[in-house]
Amino acid sequence: MAMSFEWPWQYRFPPFFTLQPNVDTRQKQLAAWCSLVLSFCRLHKQSSMTVMEAQESPLFNNVKLQRKLPVESIQIVLEELRKKGNLEWLDKNKSSFLIMWRRPEEWGKLIYQWVSRSGQNNSVFTLYELTSGEDTEDEEFHGLDEATLLRALQALQQEHKAEIITVSDGRGVKFF
C-alpha cells in the first residue's frame, strides 16, 4: 500500500535550492519548503532525523538536478517549521529534531475520535496497543512514534480527556 510521492514543481527548479534574497519571494519559498517537508515526512512516516541526514535525504538533495539545499538554509526551513509548531529541536546544538506533520493537539483529537467512535471511553490502553495494535491498523496514528504519541496524550490530558498512567509493562493511558 506504499503511495508514491509527488514532488512539487519547485523541486525541479534549480533556484529552489538557493534561498532567495527578496523578502516576498523568500517567504513563498519557505512556505513551499515547509509544505514539502511536512508532506514528505507524513508519507514516509518519518518523525525524527538529524540535520545531516536531512541534507543527504532526497528531501533536500535533488540528485537529478545535482542540487542540494545548504545546511544553513535547511536550518532556516526547520526553524520556520518550529515557529509554526511542527518541529521540536531534540538537542541544544539544533542538530536533531522531531518533525510533527500534525501538531500534538491534532494527533490527540484523532486518537480521541477513534476512542469515542469505537466505544472505548473509560478504557485503558498501553502505548503499544494504540500505535501497533490490530484495532488501530486503519487509523492514521497507527505506527506513530512514541515521542509524538506522548505529546498527543499530554494534550488530551490537559483537556481532561485522558490520563497517562504507569502499567506493568510500561506506560499506558486511560481515556474518559
From Swiss-Prot:
InterPro entries named in the record: ESCRT-II_cplx_Vps25-sub, ESCRT-II_cplx_Vps25-sub_N, WH-like_DNA-bd_sf, WH_DNA-bd_sf
Subunit (UniProt): Component of a complex at least composed of ELL, SNF8/EAP30, VPS25/EAP20 and VPS36/EAP45. Component of the endosomal sorting complex required for transport II (ESCRT-II), composed of SNF8, VPS36 and 2 copies of VPS25. Interacts with CFTR; the interaction requires misfolded CFTR. Interacts (via C-terminal half) with the ESCRT-III subunit CHMP6 (via N-terminal half).
Chief subcellular location: cytoplasm
A Gene Ontology biological process term: multivesicular body sorting pathway
Pfam families assigned to the protein according to its UniProt record, in alphabetical order: ESCRT-II
The protein's name in its UniProt record: Vacuolar protein-sorting-associated protein 25
Keyword Cytoplasm included in the entry's annotation: yes
GO molecular function list: protein homodimerization activity
Lineage: Eukaryota, Metazoa, Chordata, Craniata, Vertebrata
GO cellular component: cytosol; ESCRT II complex; mitochondrion; nucleus
Electron transport recorded as keyword: no
Organism: Mus musculus (Mouse)
Function: Component of the ESCRT-II complex (endosomal sorting complex required for transport II), which is required for multivesicular body (MVB) formation and sorting of endosomal cargo proteins into MVBs. The MVB pathway mediates delivery of transmembrane proteins into the lumen of the lysosome for degradation. The ESCRT-II complex is probably involved in the recruitment of the ESCRT-III complex. The ESCRT-II complex may also play a role in transcription regulation, possibly via its interaction with ELL.
Family listed: Belongs to the VPS25 family.
Localization (cell): Cytoplasm; Endosome membrane; Nucleus
